[in-house]
Amino acid sequence: MLNSNDVIANIAVRSLDTARKFYAGTLGLKEVDAEGEELIVFKSGKTSLFVYRSEYAGTNKATAVTWVVGDEIENDVRALKAKGVAFEHYDMAGLKREGDLHVGGDMKIAWFKDPDGNILSLVSG
């Protein structure tokens, strides 16, 4: 039923100004639309990320958005660190840590948070 439809990720934030600086300035996403002080739409590849103002910002304790970056993961982690992004380190069964990367077999993943504490990640594929 929904297998041929695109999916849009939604992130709750407290301040759209702060979110705009992070998602556009730090992560390099392109802002394509906005609805006043309530919503910003960013483009990432062929998908969209809706960032909206909410009192529940940052309350999700699980990964909210993952970017599949392939072999660029190590370069992307370095570039984001250079922009001040701090990476999270977790103890997880089946994964070993190599610096800021968690590695399991051929998969590499790195987690970080936005200014509201939403958990985001990069994965090698």
Whereabouts are the PLM-identified features?
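Core segments of cupin and vicinal oxygen chelate
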Residues: 10-49, 54-55
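Vicinal oxygen chelate
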Residues: 1-2, 6-14, 40-43, 56-125
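Short solvent-exposed loop/turn micro-motifs enriched in small/polar/acidic residues
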Residues: 33-35, 71, 103-105
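Short secondary-structure boundary/capping segments
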Residues: 1, 31-32, 40-41, 55-57, ...
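Short acidic, gly/pro-rich beta-turn/loop elements at beta-sheet edges
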Residues: 19-21, 52, 61, 75-77, ...
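Flexible, glycine-rich phosphate/dinucleotide-binding loops
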Residues: 49, 58, 96
